[in-house]
A protein has these predicted regions:
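Iron-sulfur-associated redox domains of electron-transfer enzymes in respiratory
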Residues: 39-367, 372-402
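Helix-enriched interaction subdomains in cytosolic or periplasmic regions
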Residues: 1-34, 126-131, 136-140, 402
Length: 402
């Protein structure tokens, strides 16, 4: 309960209740829950078997879960052994969006620094806890969605199949990316048909990789095979776009300190902030198998050994920017909460009532009431969710109230 960065968890009737409006899908609760009570929902493999042609889009993090001497093409071959017809990486989209980001920032005049929209958990955090910073979030879509859009628009003609016969599946490193596909907030629906976590596929993928590696040589790699580590690690985005005045930060506690600084008009000398919820970036995702530090080392070595530089025509980037191809469909807006009201007078009354109740409390954040802090309890009272006597200290005093 106390680990949740947005205080979205309450204990009611001996059960953990998660507030959907406050949850940012960071997955912290999944990793710290001692009984494993919180479980993410992914798609069973059998549910996607009806597609005539199945395309898998792996997160670049997947490659880092294996030793650096495992060629990325071996991972592709292993995925095909699992029944996928084609594997498409996000490297091309990452490179294109990196170039598009630079062009967007040059044209975008005004408040700084701008903030990346790459991490869905960070986007939700800003919408919930830092609504004044929403205007600073770069409204460019993410590499996985742009990749899936390319597949959806080009593969039907290429394969001679109907769009609905082609299944596009993502392999995700974290809960936030799963939710962003199953319940996208900034678009009507995701371009993906399904999503697996890295944990879902790792145990069945590893034996295939071990078997394929025996006797495999780099001569077996097709000449047209391309590998790009993309934005898997912290700093990957800023490395791709080759910026000067940037800041890369990871981990929710660290990110919130930076967002506090931005909200207080600090960091004005910074043009861009790459903010990621998981420590060290996506390689620290809750659904990964390997230690993030080992995975980071693997990713760096793989990048040095196998990565190809991707060339994209400048005219293509300009055309896609002007046509809105790279942008998120819907505007990024603050997420409304039931604590505040659209009516200013009502909101002020609620804030005053919250302060009045908070002053009555012991302010020791014991958590016995089922709220993570005394301030959270006061907010719950204002919302009409608890009674004052739910606080054990006020109950001992015989305090009356709602």
């Amino acid at each position: 309960m106390r680990h949740c960065p947005t205080q979205a968890i309450r204990i009611r009737g001996s059960k953990a209740i998660i507030s959907e409006e406050l949850c940012v899908d960071c997955g912290t609760c999944i990793s710290v829950c001692p009984s494993g009570a919180i479980v993410p929902i992914t798609d069973p493999v059998a549910e996607l078997s009806h597609f005539k042609y199945k395309v898998i889009v792996p997160s670049p993090v997947l490659y880092s879960q294996f030793e650096s001497n495992i060629h990325p093409y071996i991972v592709h071959l292993a995925l095909k052994k699992l029944g996928f017809d084609e594997i498409v990486d996000v490297g091309l989209s990452s490179a294109a969006l990196g170039r598009a980001l630079v062009k967007y920032m040059k044209k975008c005049q005004g408040r700084r620094p701008l903030i990346s929209s790459h991490c869905p958990s960070m986007l939700r955090l800003i919408q919930v806890k830092y609504p004044d910073l929403v205007e600073l979030v770069v409204p460019l879509d993410v590499p996985r969605e742009v990749t899936a859009k390319e597949i959806r628009t080009s593969f039907p003609d290429k394969l001679g199949l109907k769009s609905e016969d082609i299944g596009i599946i993502y392999i995700a490193p974290c809960p936030a990316k799963i939710v962003s596909i199953k319940q996208p907030a900034e678009k009507a629906r995701s371009w993906f048909d399904g999503v697996y976590s890295i944990k879902d596929v790792y145990s069945v993928l590893l034996p295939q990789i071990v078997a394929i590696k025996e006797g495999f040589t780099e001569k077996d790699v097709p000449k047209n095979f391309s590998f790009n580590a993309g934005w898997a690690t912290l700093g990957g985005m800023t490395r791709t776009v080759e910026m000067e005045n940037w800041l890369a930060v990871s981990g929710l506690d660290h990110v919130m300190k930076i967002l506090d600084d931005i909200e207080n008009s600090k960091l004005r000398n910074i043009d861009f902030v790459e903010a990621l919820a998981c420590m060290l970036g996506c390689i620290g995702g809750k659904f990964n198998v390997e230690s993030p530090y080992v995975a980071r080392t693997n990713s760096i070595k793989q990048r040095v050994k196998y990565e190809n530089r991707i060339e994209i025509k400048d005219e293509e980037i300009e055309e896609n920017l002007k046509g809105g191809y790279y942008f998120i469909e819907n505007p990024i807006l603050p997420r409304p909460t039931i604590y505040f009201d659209t009516d200013l007078e009502t909101s002020i009354k609620r804030m005053k009532e919250k302060e009045r109740v908070y002053k009555k409390l012991r302010q020791i954040d014991c958590g016995y009431c089922g709220a993570p802090t005394c301030m959270a309890f006061a907010e719950d009272y204002v919302r009409g969710e608890v009674n004052l006597t739910d606080c054990v200290f006020l109950a001992q005093k015989g305090e009356k109230g709602g």
